[in-house]
Amino acid sequence: MELGAPTEESGNAGLVAIDRALEDYRAGGFDVLVTAPLNNNENFQFSGQSRYIEDHLCAEVPSISVLVNEKLRIALATRNLPLNQVSASLSVERITKSGKLLYNSIMRDFRISNPRLAILALNPKAGDNGLLGSEEQEIITPAIEALVGEGIQAFGPYPADKFFGDSYWEQFDGILAMYYEQGLTPFRALTVEGSVNYLAGLPLICTAPEITDNLEIAGKNIADPISMRHAIYLAIDTFRHRLEYDEPMRNPLQKLYKERRDDSEKVRFSIPKRRDNREGSND
């Protein structure tokens, strides 16, 4: 292998490393995984490390990629799709599922109770009442209503330009973008340093620095370690947050009351009444 030059051997070595890591995780060897950028090759039949890890770890468990820095958490409803395929890939079910994953992750992994979610529109001006597209009326708004119906604080759909241009994003704990460029462009524009890609929804805590492989600077001692450092810190924090969140759920206190089936009134468990000492006092 040549330093700074992508080769088939180097690409295969990266895959072997990920496969071994997943094997060790299944054997209980560790709790968190932090990955470095991987140079794709023809043997890499997945669109990105996140999909590869998800499909090889437990395909039935849903996950969502969340871009994280000190100010933003942006998730993507679709991942690595050509722009002309995004609209057909969106559905009420998909957006609802993505919103739930983001909401649950923010509560459990970031320890924010009752987070506020912003859902971005797909079309310019949020479709302009159907003149610029119907996805907002037919798909995105019903998905938001479904999330609200389940007790989730979801708002939108917001036009991306106004949402970020007028700093609406500062009022939310999480943002759901519809496609790659819609989420990545403002994220990178507003990120000074230390951006991380977090794969939420899996039992394995998995983070990665949001950077490319940058092979052209290999061996020059000029690579910035901040994103990798933040990826490691986020993995550690997430592990601790999950312990804190899960601990009270393991042995919950039993109810001191039960509900009667014939009405909604709560009835306390049968407790013998204290005998009135005054009864029979005249005898």
Locations of the language-model features?
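A glycine-rich helix N-cap at a beta->alpha junction
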Residues: 50-62
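Ligand-binding beta-strand-loop-alpha-helix segment within the catalytic cores
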Residues: 67-97
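Contiguous, glycine/small-aliphatic-enriched amphipathic segments in soluble metabolic enzymes
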Residues: 1-49, 93, 97-178, 182-189, ...
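Short connector loops/turns at beta-strand edges and beta->alpha or beta->beta junctions
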Residues: 71-72, 80-82, 122-124, 210-212
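Short, flexible loop segments at boundaries between secondary-structure elements
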Residues: 60-74, 200-216
